[in-house]
UniProtKB/Swiss-Prot annotation:
It catalyses: RX + glutathione = an S-substituted glutathione + a halide anion + H(+); L-dehydroascorbate + 2 glutathione = glutathione disulfide + L-ascorbate; methylarsonate + 2 glutathione + H(+) = methylarsonous acid + glutathione disulfide + H2O. Homodimer. This is Glutathione S-transferase omega-1. It comes from Homo sapiens (Human). The gene is GSTO1. PROSITE patterns: GST_CTER, GST_NTER. Pfam families: GST_C_3, GST_N_2.
Amino acid sequence: MSGESARSLGKGSAPPGPVPEGSIRIYSMRFCPFAERTRLVLKAKGIRHEVININLKNKPEWFFKKNPFGLVPVLENSQGQLIYESAITCEYLDEAYPGKKLLPDDPYEKACQKMILELFSKVPSLVGSFIRSQNKEDYAGLKEEFRKEFTKLEEVLTNKKTTFFGGNSISMIDYLIWPWFERLEAMKLNECVDHTPKLKLWMAAMKEDPTVSALLTSEKDWQGFLELYLQNSPEACDYGL
């Protein structure tokens, strides 16, 4: 089965057939923030696509032929071409498909977006550390790290004097960093943006975007997934289905 809410494919499953002409396939996982980047771009650009969910706790053998790292997201087109690594898949979609351009044409503005992505780059690993941390001392130290990283992003918005990181409308960089901010509430980390008012306004503006709101995961589902994921349960990726 394919689709956003289809159960994931695991070890022993048969590989899906060829991608139909005129479509593109994303190998994804419903709760993965890296895969969400690519799903946001697919939705924002209105690209016809199918979704194959992968069980990351029980990966199918054939999936390593799609991506030697065994990670999502992976894109596969009807020519059998494979593209992986989330930021690369997003740039590919923007260049390969018509419609709204999410990356700026201007080389300097494009470079600015990539530099902001570098400024953000510690946040995903901090989220991973926070999820796995076991004691209050770890929590306190990690929360301080989050505040430091968010201050850097606050400075970008302050200097730009715009609502979004690429200007006055949503662009690629906003979609690339959003999935981790979406999860702050579920992880009880909202207080880490209390000192960054412009970042809080950006988060509120992002939730108003039709693409973002269509792909939001409820706090309950995210916490349910996380509980099973930390137990290494193969059922984690299908939580709520």
